[in-house]
């Protein structure tokens, strides 16, 4: 079975990011949050979650993705938006489909 890591680039997402993490919690995915020169409120909002936080200084979205990908130790990774625009159920379906093909 393939494991999945989620990479979530974020900047100033104190309102939406905790909700996204809560929605992902039941799926037990490894989660990297890449914070790109974010505000203190975002850091405070997610500091107690079981996620790995990667800090970077204003390098932008592309570099945030690269940093997250470099940290991955699983066969699969997925970029997930911090604003809650993706449904975590779709990730589960995608992973089930991939595993059924192996």
Label every PLM stretch briefly.
Residues 1-102:
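Structured catalytic core of nucleotide-sugar glycosyltransferases
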